[in-house]
Amino acid sequence: MRRGPALLTLAVVIALLALSQHAGKQTAPLPDLRGRTLRAAQLAARDAGFRQLAAADALDRHRVPVLGGNWKVCSQQPPPARYALTTPVTLRVVKTGEACPRR
């Protein structure tokens, strides 16, 4: 019986499992994105390492924020703090010139 290839395969599998578990636990500080344009906020979040970004109309008018420079961030979920890089980030926005809704 040849143990060499089987042990090598087992070692590779264990190493890959360890790496995948470590990758899911990487964290970074999510900055305060309020008051920025949607585009600037998205760039700042991406620069911090966050990739799961969404934008929603803060006035609940069902508008789709398309041009990031024409929208202003009113709030974010989750709030600024340290999170896993896999954490989804939602930015609630209004069109530039509109007032943010009261909480």
Task: Please annotate each region the language model reported.
Residues 1-103:
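Ligand-recognition elements built from short beta-strands and adjacent flexible loops
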